[in-house]
Amino acid sequence: MPIVFNPSFTVAERELRWGRVRQRMAAEKLDCLIAFPNQGRFEQLQANTRYLTQMGGFATEVAVVFPLANEVTAFVQSPGDVDWWSKAQCWITDVRCSRRVWAKAMIERLKELKFSRVGVIGLSGLKRAPEGVVPWTMLENVKKAFPNAEFVNATHITLEARAVKSAEEIAFIEKAEHIAEASVTAMFKIARAGVRENELYAEMLKTMVAEGGELPTMLYWSAGRPGIRHLVPTPSPLAAGDVIANEIEGKFCGYIAQIGAPAIVGPIPDKTIATYEAAAKLFDNLCSVIKAGRKLPDVGRDYVQMVKDAGYQPAAWPLHGRGLGDDLPIMQNALAETDETFEEGHVLIIKPGMIDPNDTSDSNERVGDTVVVTKTGARRLGKLPLVITSIPL
C-alpha cells in the first residue's frame, strides 16, 4: 500500500519564509539560528521550528540548525523518523538522526559551518512562556563546544516572520477551521443530559483525526454552574441547566483555528439568548473595524465603547494571533498601550467578552472565531452560526 502523506507547502513558500528570516538575521549580524525540540503546550512551543522546517505533529520531536547562507539541517529522533520526514516534506534534504542526544547531533552540524554569532530560538520573548523554552543542558553543551561564539536570543526573528500569513498558510488555517467546526457538529449530535464529558471529548477527537486533523490540540472546557475551565476530560455527566463554555482548536499540518461553541443543557432562558445575540453583534462589529493599518489600541477602545453602548460591561479581551501557535499580534487587554498595527494577512482569534451588570454570577458571555485581517475588515473563517446551543435533556 503506497503511503499518502499529508499536504505540504511548496518550495516557493519555503523561499518566502526563509527569505524573511534571513533578512532579519542579516540585519542583526547572526550567522546561524538554532532551535531545540519542545512539544509543550500542544506543540505550540515548537512553532518556530515548524515554521522553518514544516516538520512536526503527533508529538514529533524536531530541532533545526538554520544558517544564514548554507544548507538547513533538521534533526529528528530515530532512523525511522529520518526516513519518514525525508519523504513527507520537500524543503529539507539534510535530515539527521539525534538518537535523543540533540546537542551532540547539532554540534556535529555546527562544526561544518563558519560562525561567530548564533541566535537561539526560544530563550525568551514568548508571551505564554516568558521564561523561555530552551532545555538548559542542551544549550550549555552547545555553548561549551564553541566557547568563542556568541549566543543571543533570536525568538523575535521567527515570531516577526510568522506574523503575516501567506495565501498557502491561510488555506491551511481554513482547513483547520473546518476540522474544528466538524468536531463541534459531531459533539452536538450526541450531547444530551447524562452523556459524559469524556464521551463528547472522544467524539470530537475522532472527528478531528478523521477529517485530517492533527494531535495534540487544545479542547478547553467547562460545564456546570459555576464551571471550572479545564483541559482534562472528566467522567462527569451533563446535567440539566449546565452552562458549557469552551475553546476548541482544530489543527491541520500544525496550523490552528479556534472557535467557541457555547451551550446550555435544556431550554435557554430568553435573557441568555439576548445576551449571546448581543455578543454575536459585537463580534461582527469588531470585524468591521479590524482593518490593515489600524492600531491595536484604537480597536481596543472601539471594543470598550461598543460593549457599553450595548448596555454591558467590558470583560476579558482575548485578541491574539494564531497560526502555528501564539503568533503576533497579541493584545492582552483592551487598553494596553502599543504601537502595533494590524497588517493584511494577520490571522487572529477574537472572542470579546461582555458582562451583564445585573448578572450576579459575573459570567463572561462571549462568542469567538478565527479571522483574517484584510484592508476592509476582518474576514471570519467559520460558517457555523455564532449562537448558544440548547442540548437536549
Task: Enumerate the predicted regions with their spans.
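Active-site neighborhoods and metal-handling regions in enzymes and metal-associated proteins
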Residues: 1-393
